[in-house]
Amino acid sequence: MASSTDVRPKITLACEVCKHRNYITKKNRRNDPDRLEIKKFCPNCGKHQAHKESR
């Protein structure tokens, strides 16, 4: 099993507008200790929106 101090944990990206969790990705905790925010396509909204790391 993965430990809680894993360097590359799986994270879920949720749309800022509709709050749907659309993407699952990995991030490097050493390079990005803060919450990740990326502009990606939201299929629910039908356009590109900011997606933020959700817990």
Swiss-Prot record:
GO cellular component: cytoplasm; ribonucleoprotein complex; ribosome
Record GO biological process: translation
Keywords on record: Ribonucleoprotein, Ribosomal protein
InterPro entries in the record: Ribosomal_bL33 (IPR001705), Ribosomal_bL33_CS (IPR018264), Ribosomal_bL33_sf (IPR038584), Ribosomal_zn-bd (IPR011332)
PROSITE patterns: RIBOSOMAL_L33
MF GO annotations: structural constituent of ribosome
Domain of life of the organism encoding this protein: Bacteria
Signal peptide: none
Coiled coil spans: none
Cell membrane recorded as keyword: no
Family according to the record: Belongs to the bacterial ribosomal protein bL33 family.
Protein name as annotated: Large ribosomal subunit protein bL33A
Origin species: Mycolicibacterium vanbaalenii (strain DSM 7251 / JCM 13017 / BCRC 16820 / KCTC 9966 / NRRL B-24157 / PYR-1) (Mycobacterium vanbaalenii)
Upper lineage: Bacteria, Bacillati, Actinomycetota, Actinomycetes, Mycobacteriales
